[in-house]
Swiss-Prot record:
[4Fe-4S] cluster binds at residues 71-72, 136, 166. Its cofactor is [4Fe-4S] cluster. One of its GO terms (cellular component) is plasma membrane. It comes from the Bacteria. It catalyses: a quinone + NADH + 5 H(+)(in) = a quinol + NAD(+) + 4 H(+)(out). InterPro entries: NADH_UbQ_OxRdtase-like_20kDa, NADH_UQ_OxRdtase_20Kd_su. It is a peripheral membrane protein. The keyword Cell inner membrane applies. This is NADH-quinone oxidoreductase subunit B 1. Its main location: membrane. Binds 1 [4Fe-4S] cluster. GO terms for molecular function: 4 iron, 4 sulfur cluster binding; iron ion binding; NADH dehydrogenase (ubiquinone) activity; NADH:ubiquinone reductase (non-electrogenic) activity; quinone binding.
Length: 192
């Protein structure tokens, strides 16, 4: 996050039960906490809620695991190469599901591969997110009417972001990653 020079960081307004006499949250006029807050403000500290700090850390260090099943995986690999450099957004690849926050399902999901997808998804720690990449992962795509194809990976795992295209470009996938980061910032650490 880049700030213009000379701007002041301000913590969000405190939430809580409002005092009917003053219209401010209870405890906001407490002299002890007011003094501590003023001392910290003079020394250059930032006071914020833990929830916002955790969300900031989660969006800046997303580790993704590939589940490349078809040609979309080539575009997924291209996204992590120097031209697009997904790591500048804090989105780095990992090979193990136990170290991953995000799974990118790229390509045609067959009926035989569906249990493996679910098993890998179950091995990921909470909170975990899924990006469905391409027409085949979104809804079966070109092979929609085949007997052996799952018509969308959302029938096997919950999907957070859908990236359309056949295959979607690396820019489209990068935009999906940015949308996922925005979604994580909007939701709290407890709820999903």
């Amino acid at each position: 996050m880049e700030l213009a020079s000379g701007t002041t960081l301000v913590a969000p307004q405190p939430k809580g039960i409002l005092d009917p006499a003053t219209g401010k949250p209870i405890g906001s006029n407490d002299a002890f906490f007011g003094e501590i807050n003023n001392e910290l403000a003079d020394k250059g500290f930032l006071v914020t809620s833990t929830d916002e700090l955790i969300n900031w850390a989660r969006t800046g260090s997303l580790m993704w695991m590939t589940f490349g099943l078809a040609c979309c995986a080539v575009e997924m690999m291209q996204m992590s190469m120097p031209r697009y450099d997904a790591e500048r957004f804090g989105f780095a690849p990992r090979a193990s599901p136990r170290q991953s926050d995000v799974m990118i399902v790229a390509g045609t999901l067959t009926n035989k591969m569906a249990p493996a997808l679910r098993k890998v998804y179950d091995q990921m720690p909470e909170p975990r997110y899924v990006i469905s990449m391409g027409s085949c992962a979104n809804g079966g795509g070109y092979y929609h009417y085949s007997y052996s194809v799952v018509r969308g990976c959302d029938r096997v795992v919950p999907v957070d972001i859908y990236v359309p295209g056949c295959p979607p470009t690396a820019e489209a996938l990068l935009y999906g990653v940015l949308l996922l980061q925005k979604k994580i910032r909007r939701t709290g650490t407890i709820e999903r």
